[in-house]
Amino acid sequence: MLHSFRRSLLLLALCTPAVLAQKKVKEVKPGAVELKRLENQWAAGLVRRDRALFDRLLAKRFIYTENDKMMQRDDVLHEVAEGTDTVTAARNEDMDVHEFGATTAVVTGWLIVDGRSKGQPFTHRYRFTDTWVKRKAGWQIVAAQDYLAPR
């Protein structure tokens, strides 16, 4: 009996570190899946110059900052539809969704944009922080901040 008890203690001592070292499986929340989908729509909308998409996604009082400039919703809509740069490809990488209750979330990640400006090709890598609010009609972005990462 004592031998059996010692064997159980030894087994417990050997197994406990392995159990504790296991990585916790990250829970995927439905809001996170939806927000990543919307962020990817944003990237695709840049290529298509999809004003209707941005009109739907951007809240009425949306604000955007990029490096040293700030724009309101109407400025962003104009830039998307009629801006001088041509975006040929855009994709998101390493997105994380930080939910604050059921109706507010912040999405962080990288946006990589390829295109042409004044006849010259470019590839820009932006670090972004987007703040989303869930309304009756669905998620809308209320604020976005991007900065152009140094090469």
Go through the PLM ranges and name each one.
Residues 29-36, 48-103, 116, 120-124:
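A solvent-exposed, acidic/Ser-Thr-rich amphipathic alpha-helical stretch
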Residues 22-30:
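Cleaved targeting-peptide boundary
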